[in-house]
Design a protein with these regions (language model features):
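Bacterial Sec-dependent N-terminal signal peptides
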Residues: 1-24
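Serine/threonine-rich low-complexity intrinsically disordered regions
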Residues: 2, 23, 87, 99, ...
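Residues at the start of alpha-helices and the adjacent loop-to-helix junctions
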Residues: 6-8, 13, 29, 132, ...
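Compositionally biased alpha-helical segments
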Residues: 21-123, 127-142, 170, 247-298
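Extracytoplasmic low-complexity/disordered linkers and repeat tracts associated with LysM-containing
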Residues: 85-89, 97, 101-105, 186-193, ...
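A short, hydrophobic beta-strand-centered structural micro-motif
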Residues: 135-156
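Surface-exposed short loop/turn segments
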Residues: 152-194, 203-223, 229, 240-290
């Protein structure tokens, strides 16, 4: 009798353990946080999964996944090529993709276009193509994007002219859409923008018809020969992000979009037709002021 009862409990315990193991799901770690799912397939470029008790199968780029914790206890880690981009200085970190699955679920930042043309019919085709690509990355970075999905590419080789016909130098154009994996914490950004004063340190500008982006020091000193500080007149939250206005920034645009904000630096952006401009604003916590304190301004 005692053996029968013991066998019953052992059987029930085994069944419960099996059921628990069966009910446990996989955990997929995405850019926006972990999700409990059932992983169906880990392919070369994509991962297919479904949600518990659902039949719909979803597909996502492996670039958007940092890790999978399988129900079995095994873990698989992925190295994403997506890197942080806070403005023009990080333009080389912009990831170029030709695969639409790479940008599913990412935050769109705007349409892009870049063009580069050789100076003469002896210009290097590769050099011109690389310059067009750098301009594409630069424009994306100035929109606060770190991923570009290329839509169209046009490339023309050098065309040598004749006695009655002018030649054409090589040209490359790219068009695409900018995306970001980095989402601005709206409440945190608004609080920080309202609580601090800033100095307009640099201005970065890109004209699509120009050779490359321009960088200019914008520092203005007050009557005591100290960098001029200012506060924002308004901080506004909209559907697509946070906007600010400040009379101390030399722009005719009433509202500038915030593309990056931390304790040391804020980058705000305006875009007019073919020209995009970033205003680099720094706070008292920036290392620039620490270095300034160690020297004397004449």
């Amino acid at each position: 009798m005692n053996k029968s009862i013991l066998l019953f409990f052992v059987t029930m315990a085994s069944f419960s353990s099996f059921a628990l193991a069966q009910s446990k799901n996989d955990v997929i770690h995405l850019i926006d946080g972990p999700k409990e799912v059932q992983v169906i397939e880990v392919g070369f470029n994509t991962i297919k999964y479904s949600f518990p008790n659902e039949n719909t199968v979803y597909s996502i780029s492996k670039h958007q996944v940092s890790k999978i914790e399988f129900a079995s206890g095994r873990e698989e880690v992925f190295n994403s090529p997506f890197k942080p981009v806070n403005g023009l200085d990080d333009f080389q970190n912009v990831y170029i993709s030709y695969n639409p699955e790479d940008v599913v679920g990412l935050d769109p930042r705007g349409e892009l276009f870049s063009k580069a043309t050789g100076v003469t019919t002896l210009s290097s085709i590769n050099n011109v193509k690389n310059r067009a690509m750098d301009k594409l990355k630069a424009e994306a970075s100035m929109l606060g994007a770190n991923v570009v999905l290329v839509g169209n590419v046009f490339q023309r080789g050098n065309q040598y002219g004749g006695e009655n016909q002018a030649g054409n130098s090589t040209q490359t154009t790219f068009s695409g859409t900018a995306y970001s994996t980095q989402k601005l914490d709206l409440e945190k950004a608004k609080s920080m923008l309202l609580d601090q004063s800033f100095h307009h340190y640099q201005t970065h500008k890109l004209n699509r018809n120009s050779w490359s982006p321009e960088r200019a020091i914008a520092t203005v000193y007050d009557k005591d020969r100290k960098p001029l500080m200012f506060e924002f007149d308004k901080v506004i939250e909209k559907e697509d992000g946070v906007y600010v206005s400040a009379s101390k920034i030399p722009t005719k645009t009433k509202e500038l979009k915030v593309i990056h904000a931390d304790n040391e630096m804020v980058v705000v952006m305006e875009r007019n037709d073919k020209i995009i401009t970033n205003y680099i604003l720094i706070s008292k916590d920036n290392k620039y002021f620490k270095n300034l304190a160690s020297r004397v301004i004449l």
